[in-house]
Amino acid sequence: MQVDSRIVVTLTSRLYADEISKLQERVGSVVPLKDSHRLQNLNSVGMYSVYMRNVAPDFVAMFSYLSEATLAILDEVTPDTLVFSRLDHSQNYELKNVYYPSFAWHSHTLLTVVPPVFGREAATVALESNGFEIVFPVVMPHALAQAVLQKLMLYNIYARLSDANVGDVNMDHVRFHATTLHHMGRAYTLHIDQANPGGMLGLLDNLAIYLAIISALLPNSLARLLPAIMRHEQHELLNIFAGVAPPDDGGDFNIEDDMQKMESFMAYMQSVSSIFNLGPKLRLGQYSSETQSGTAWLAS
């Protein structure tokens, strides 16, 4: 059954010619919308609600917003309306690589929708005619998106250590390494050093708490499995950790206790994994670098 995925955004004023031109350059790009309704207004479009001008950005809040928002593709721009196609898991879509900065895409790869971590200005189309700014996300290869998250987390870890006077932290050195992303011979600057640390620090607090709880919930049988595997040399990489494994205490196994611990252990492990989840993911099928477009669908 064909699902009507068309979303129409009605503008309060007619767009200027240069605004139409700038938006038409973005046709084929992914845009988050606040709602899934068929008829919406301009305030629903893009990431302005979580990335306002002259406000320190909270990138963790932006990742969360992207995960919860309705994702759509900008299909058409007219003087009075913007037309989108809502992304659905059962459909394929024509996606264009028209983001700033632009990263090379390749066929049969995984893409991730991330906040505009490379700067708000490059990601924004200002609509003076309507007194609004559309802030676009960036769609980039998943491996690069993971690198962005790693740098974002490490920068905030070191910033917190520096603020707490723990050790000798050279923030200029940290900033140099954590705010630069290298890819295919080019260097990209991450605008994360002026971000609001609230969301990331909360995430790091949760991570520390979860890891502490997980260490206490580790089933005895699982803890004693590591030395057993080492003795039988079932995996060569375990030799690296030979000096780390605790000695077997030789106590009796308790399956009832381990069953309870394993249930909680797995629940908290899933919580930890959710911390590292990035924004929505798209599976790219065939991609043409000449047209900068390819077939894509939402990845589960």
Curated annotation (Swiss-Prot):
InterPro entries for this protein: Herpes_capsid_2 (IPR002690)
Entry superkingdom: Viruses
GO cellular component terms given for this protein: host cell nucleus; viral capsid
Keyword tags: Capsid protein, Host nucleus, Virion
Main location: virion
GO-annotated molecular function: structural molecule activity
Protein name: Triplex capsid protein 2
